[in-house]
């Protein structure tokens, strides 16, 4: 109820004093390791391909998913039959990709005795898969499991909400669930005063950070090169290997961004340059109970400290992280100042800027390797991809630290998770 009052008060333009949204003095506390901790053992991802134009435009999602499932198991030398469960986030495939994901499991050599489910919480599906596997570990259903996300936006259609009752006309919030995502971005920009200049500044920074990270090889440890077949303009098959993200544009300039026309509304501020890219990709994260990881001699890349999902108004769904992040931090007993890296999905620059400003997050802590504006946003994959990128970057830095993964969710939600990197 308090959160609802805070959200409604902010939407009405009233000042609020919720301490959960304020950056408090640094109070980082690293808890003692517990045998029951849910730990991240390892994670890999495919490169992110440009939908309909990139190297994965003809690659089916089961092949993308199989690539990361196989790589994670091989990297840590885990026997596939030791998995207790697999959860796969997917948005666009029929039935959240339930059949596709089970096929990918078998293509990866994982036996039928290992169960699998899929989940669709839209843009947070990959992170929800992580939470689902963590929940199974915590409740004792199993000790080790795989959380994944996958999306082929090249091969799957968007925009059909399915069979909807005509009674949605009776509810404003129900109608708002059908607001096009681009229009929710325009709503955020207008309602909260996020200028075109701020959006383009944020987009340029994302491209520059991603280009720098790519040139320095920062993604090399997390990316699984994928050899696949692509059809050229003449319809001829060609075998290629995709080994790096395709959406990064090192030549991006403010002048170039400023020339782009509004994509969703005349006189609007959301453009193709300050929005996330339509993309293809997959990611997989291996989780375990700490005691099981130690028993099997598996590495520990991180510890899941908290997870939260919140609801916000559907027509400004992009503000979700501004409310999910404080909820996750509170569960972990932490503040904004305790976090070294915030991986906040850049669905649109408008909503990302709003969330960063609302929470008072220093710019240098936000998406240090770039985000979805530069890297791309394969819907079901993104949450799992962010976990892999976050923990690998914390590992590169070497010291014990906390990081946050968060994203907005279509129809009006936000999700966030807090991870601890244990230090080299």
UniProtKB/Swiss-Prot annotation:
Segment forming the signal sequence: none
Quaternary structure note: Homodimer. Interacts (via PTS2-type peroxisomal targeting signal region) with PEX7; leading to its translocation into peroxisomes.
Cited Pfam families: Thiolase_C, Thiolase_N
Gene that this polypeptide is encoded by: Acaa1a
Cellular-component GO terms for this entry: mitochondrion; peroxisomal matrix; peroxisome
Tissue: Mainly expressed in liver and intestine.
Organism placement in taxonomy: Eukaryota, Metazoa, Chordata, Craniata, Vertebrata
MF-aspect GO terms: acetyl-CoA C-acetyltransferase activity; acetyl-CoA C-acyltransferase activity; acetyl-CoA C-myristoyltransferase activity
Protein origin, superkingdom: Eukaryota
Family under the similarity heading: Belongs to the thiolase-like superfamily. Thiolase family.
Protein name: 3-ketoacyl-CoA thiolase A, peroxisomal
EC supergroup of this enzyme: transferase
């Amino acid at each position: 109820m308090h959160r609802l009052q805070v959200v409604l008060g902010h939407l009405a333009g009233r000042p609020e004093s919720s301490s959960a949204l304020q950056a408090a003095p640094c109070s980082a506390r690293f808890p003692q390791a517990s045998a029951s901790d849910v730990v991240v053992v390892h994670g890999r991802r495919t490169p992110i391909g440009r939908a309909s134009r990139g190297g994965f435009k003809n690659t089916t999602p089961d092949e993308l998913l199989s690539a990361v499932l196989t790589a994670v198991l091989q990297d840590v030398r885990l026997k596939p039959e030791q998995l207790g469960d697999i959860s796969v986030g997917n948005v666009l495939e029929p039935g959240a990709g339930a059949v596709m994901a089970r096929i990918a499991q078998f293509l990866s050599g994982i036996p039928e005795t290992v169960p699998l489910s899929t989940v669709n919480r839209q843009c947070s599906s990959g992170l929800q898969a992580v939470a689902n596997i963590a929940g199974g570990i915590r409740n004792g259903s199993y000790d080790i499991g795989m959380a994944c996300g996958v999306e082929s936006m090249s091969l799957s259609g968007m925009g059909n909400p399915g069979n909807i009752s005509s009674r949605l006309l009776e509810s404003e919030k129900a109608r708002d669930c059908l607001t096009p995502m681009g229009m929710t971005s325009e709503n955020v920009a207008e309602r909260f005063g996020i200028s075109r200049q701020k959006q383009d500044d944020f987009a340029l920074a994302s491209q520059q950070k991603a280009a720098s990270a790519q040139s320095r090889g920062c993604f090399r440890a997390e990316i699984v090169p994928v050899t696949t077949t692509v059809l050229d303009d003449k319809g001829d098959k060609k075998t290629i290997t995709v080994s790096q993200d395709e959406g990064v544009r090192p030549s991006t300039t403010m002048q170039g961004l400023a020339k782009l026309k509004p994509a969703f509304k005349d006189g609007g501020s959301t453009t193709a340059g300050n929005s996330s890219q339509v993309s293809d990709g997959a990611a997989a994260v291996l989780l375990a109970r700490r005691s099981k990881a130690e028993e099997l001699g598996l590495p520990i890349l991180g510890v899941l400290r908290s997870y939260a999902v919140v609801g916000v108004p559907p027509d400004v769904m992009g503000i979700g992280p501004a409310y999910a992040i404080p909820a996750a931090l509170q569960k972990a007993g932490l503040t904004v100042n305790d976090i070294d890296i915030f991986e906040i999905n850049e669905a649109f620059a408008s909503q990302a800027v709003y969330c960063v400003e609302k929470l008072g997050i220093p710019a240098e802590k936000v998406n240090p390797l770039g985000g979805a504006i530069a890297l791309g946003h394969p819907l079901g994959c993104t949450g799992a991809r962010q976990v892999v990128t976050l923990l690998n970057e914390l590992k590169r830095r070497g010291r014990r630290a906390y990081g946050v993964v968060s994203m907005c969710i279509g129809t009006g939600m936000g999700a966030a998770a807090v991870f601890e990197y244990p230090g080299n």
